[in-house]
Amino acid sequence: MRGMLTLFLILGFIAQRVEAQHYSGRILDKETAHALVGVEVLTERGHRLARTDDQGLFSFDYPVDSLRVILSADSYRQRRVTLYSGRVLEFRLQPLQTELQEVTITGHGGTRGNNTFGYSPADVKGIATLAGEVDVMRYPQILPGVSQGMEGGMGFYVRGAGNGNNRTELDGIPIPAPTHLFGLFSIFHPDIVGQSTFQMGGITASSGDFTSSLLQIRTRRPSARRYKGSFALSPLMIGGSLEGYITRDKLTFQVAGRSSLLRPEFLLLRLLVGKDNISGDFNPQAQDLYGKLRWEISAEHSLEALLFGSHDYFSYLPEEEPNAERNKISLGWINKALKASWLYTPSKHLSLETSVYYTDCGTRQAQVSDGDWGVHKGLMMGSEKKELALRSHLTTRIHDIDLGMGIDLRQQHFRPMVQTLSIEGNKARDWRPAYTTTIASVFAEGVYRRPHYAVQGGIRYDLFRSHERHISHNIDLRLKGSLPLTRELGVEATYDRLTQYQHTLEGLPIGWSLDLIVPASQRFRPEHADQWYLGGFWSTPDLSVSLGGYYRHLTNLTAYRSWLNQFSLHNVSWEEDITTGQGNSYGLELWLEKRQGRLTGSLSYTLSRTTRTFSELNGGQSYPFSFDRTHILNVQSRYETIHTAHREQHLTLAGYLTSGNTMTIPIANYQAEELPFWNTQKGGILVPPEQEHHATTRTEMSTMNAYRLPPYIRLDLGYSFLWRRKKVTHELGISIYNVLNRRNPYLIFHENGRWRQLSLLSIVPSVRWEIRF
């Protein structure tokens, strides 16, 4: 009996020893102290235990008191550390090099599944761009569920929503117009970017006022112990950055800026070939400027000030001809942002950030004509949006739950349209009324992780006061759950209820910055989106695969009755030009990623259908969305040809195959009734055939977006060289956009009895040189 009792005691002791122990910690960048997303925590045999979230946190259970693990992330040195149960530890990983690396597109999902993706600037350097610029906003375009707008542009349409339903934030500041030169590339200098997170489902509740996706760009913390800088040159831009300390380990700074070379290049070309051989004057400009000042007051308190701005301008003045009308066209847009923040971190488990920011986004379009007999006339249009906000965000950890909560107070000023009509110096300016709205929000969210499941939930309450002083209340929900079935296999589900308090009236579908932004009101209520996602994932240290399906329902959408209305001079107001409706989208998404070895890359495929329904459009019948692309296939690959201590060379190859977008086309002509007094008005004067045709012939159009353009096919190629010297690093990138020189159709039209195709881009080579010190 005594022996049996002893045996039970021994077994009880052993069972107690093998009971699962809880491990948790946080992983940061050693140089910038930024949280690292997607760092894998591996056993020494390579089995994955956990992956860090968008705050750099990880947690898991394992049946030992201490455990030796490997911390692994692309672009960082692997590190072996020892974890101890019940203790929250912080680790810092050393970047492989201080400069950005030329790597392929191998972003790290902040969680497994097709809903959250974290990445750094190094992860986007392999994407070929028209400007040759490293562009942090290019990465979302190669993910599943994302459809591109205009070829080469930055507009993207996520799971059936519009380009204006996305939200882009720079350190929590919304940036309404985040692109340069009609959307060719973003306004964010690559040197200022630390980690970025792109969310399509299970979205954080700390951000609101959108119904599609959230792109959060976090800037780097300036270096506190050394000075670093860069200079870069490409065909379109010249730029540089500098960072360092004013007081070592206390007061640090970073400045960065870029400017377009198109205007100097045009003037040089005109000088070389002769002014007489170039017709007109062409003046494109693009600039961006960034500055950050950080003061580490103590281990617990820090202050930060941020300044950001961008400016775009384009004008064309044709050559003057005798007795001919000359039209000067100009347009431009600006972004201005200021932010001051205080960060209080009394412990590793508690932080409070309070900030105030101001943003100003404005657009202008003008056309001035020198008519016959010296008559001058012009039309100028513009819009602007200003926002002032106060925000406080608390994060903490209670037992196994990571919690976040806060408040968000915003006041917005919209001026949707300003018109100035000028004839012979007499100006008639129509300042459309400014609309002031207020949004007060309270939010809370939490993440609970266990070995066999993880649950994330968030709630956001908004009190919205429209410009008519009408108050409405809305509650957003953000839910995500994952259930591992084995160590590598699992399932994930999300639900999101989202609300947006502004409408974006898109003109030409190119994703540029001249779309009209108008506030929600009693007549045009806030937009809502409900989205469900269910999928599975399989992941090893080298390979990950995700497959899932989504359904999204959108309400209170707005659209022009005719997109030509935005260019009309006879508009009473924008309210009379638009109508409201709803949309639906559903599809399957596949994401495959290889992360290790000399050959790395990714593949994404989307099979989807998206429709819109407006009572005043298409006879009230549902019709395909303009960017309802049934099939979207993106393949990215990178091969490391040379890797030594002083040299690196990489070959990148990317392929794109998608269904063409849809459009409405003319399908027939028929004879119309003769206009009243038409013969009288002709008065015996010979009328040009084209004018006669339009007066007596009518065109029948197809149903809305009934025609689908041919498939979009593109192949990009790139090669990069990197040389490390004692004090400087040189990097040369060569890329060829559209190697096949395929003329992909942007639209088709019928002219002079023939169908014609408009294509925007052919083959475009580019070179970018960069030096870092």
Language-model regions, residue ranges each:
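Periplasmic N-terminal accessory/gating domains of Gram-negative outer-membrane beta-barrel systems
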Residues: S75-R77, R87, T111-I203, R220
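Outer membrane beta-barrel strand-and-loop segments of large Gram-negative receptors
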Residues: E387-R391, D430-F443, S521, R525, ...
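Transmembrane beta-barrel wall of Gram-negative outer-membrane proteins
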Residues: L236-S259, K275-Y313, S330-L352, I398, ...
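Structural signature of Gram-negative outer-membrane beta-barrels, strongest in the C-terminal barrel
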Residues: F308, D400, G404, D408, ...
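Gram-negative outer-membrane beta-barrel transporters
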Residues: R449, Y551-H553, E576-T662
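Surface-exposed extracellular loop regions of Gram-negative outer-membrane beta-barrel proteins
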Residues: Y313, G362-R364, H413-S422, R487-W532, ...
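Flexible loop and strand-edge segments within Gram-negative outer membrane beta-barrel domains
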Residues: F282, S302-K348, L352, D360-K386, ...
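C-terminal beta-signal and adjacent terminal beta-strands/loops
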Residues: E265, Y656-T696, L709-D716, S720-F773
